[in-house]
Amino acid sequence: VIEAQQLSKRFGALAAVRAVSFTAADGRITGLLGPNGAGKSTTLRMLYTVLKPDCGDALIDGHSALRAPLAAARCLGVLPHGAGIYPNLSARENILYFGALQGLTRAAARSRAAELVRLLEMEEFAERRAKGFSQGERLKTALARALVHSPRNLVLDEPTNGLDVMAVRALRRLLGALRDVCCSRAT
């Protein structure tokens, strides 16, 4: 469960986020909607502890983003807007690197990477350098990195940006399947 509690953030005179509160329940897909500049990305950055709120807090599976930011962040898989992947690493190496950053052993990271490559249908490009990847291949690689540590919560910032209609549909199906797999494991 993700709980935003009166999150607020200012940048100088600009109030980017004003007292935002919501709950994103387990097993649900929750979206933040609003026009450009409404503070959606800023709100997400406060959730995944990249930005500290001026007021309020966020609880990620009970961990305070303010008082226990590392514990809160480890409960999240994050796909930030414009998620860059390392172009000189293969897709699999990108996943393994993030596994190491999340504290996975080499064996656990290898096993999880193999599982994600299958789940996300990345077999054709898993061993290729990411430099020439299509937008869809980059997205799958970034999504695999976000999922490598098997987080209970996934935060996506504009995941369909730059994708064609077919890729958007495929991503929606994939996210629904991921939710179904994760929710069936939890029960």
Regions found by a protein language model. Give the residues of each.
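Hydrophobic anchor residue at the start of the ABC signature
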Residues: 143
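Conserved catalytic motifs of ABC-family nucleotide-binding domains
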Residues: 150
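Conserved ABC transporter NBD signature motif
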Residues: 56-67, 71-72
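Conserved ABC ATPase "signature" region
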Residues: 96, 100, 107-125
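Helical segment within the ABC ATPase nucleotide-binding domain
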Residues: 168-181
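Catalytic Walker B motif of ABC-type/P-loop ATPase nucleotide-binding domains
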Residues: 154-158
